[in-house]
Amino acid sequence: QIHGKQLSYNNYNDIFSALTISRSLPKGKGTVIVKHANPCGVSAKNDHLESYKSALSCDPVSAFGGIVSCNFKIKSDLAVELNKLFLEVIIANGFDSNAIKILKAKKNLRLIDGTNYTSGELFKFVSFNQGIMIQSEDLNIFSKKNFKVVSKRKPTSKQLKDLIFAFNVCRYVKSNAIVLASNETTVGIGSGQPSRLDSCEIAINKMKKFNLQTDNLVAASDAFFPFVDGIEKLVQSGVRAVVQPSGSIRDKEIINFANETNTVLLFSKTRHFRH
């Protein structure tokens, strides 16, 4: 920590989530905004100012009072933009001298240099009345080799890139999780709902609320769709490609629906389920 007041328990929890997500994004391009350990905006852009603005556009309301983590060095132009929003913590791979001067104008804003942060192998510990459970964190970075195209329609190279991006982000969203994305930027995130259909509707409504509809929309789900209704809702909202884990007794129905609607569908053998 190089500036700001003392970190709280919740700050540390959010910082870990933000650092972990930003480190999973393409190096030198990634920005993530986290609120209550959930990402509310994620983007990967070569232009750092655009990366932040794109992440913020996903849900600027939820971003208020959140944490921003960038896997690149913050310079003065971005610092000026960051100071326009109330934030608890900003994490980056360093800050140039002008950026520090600008950001220090807010005396309580916590600035963290995460340059030397390495995740390594991490474990999650959960205590309960009669004991403790330990499991390794879900940190694998997914690539093209981890997915199988099961629809007749094949993804374009752009769709595949966005699908991989969305699925990698999806693992950090509390289940049931749905991530809508375009151009390596989230445009709608539905999280923490007992019903996967409800998470679909939340993601869609967020996208519409902030006018982020696009012709190049893809969606990722952290687990399989138990019924057709979820993917149907996504396709009706403009989604043209979907990635989801397989394993449902209705997988064939999902594939048939994708083919009937000319939708790209990819299956993964791995579920996320963040709790």
Model-derived segments and spans:
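ATP-dependent carboxylate/acyl-activation modules
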Residues: 1-275
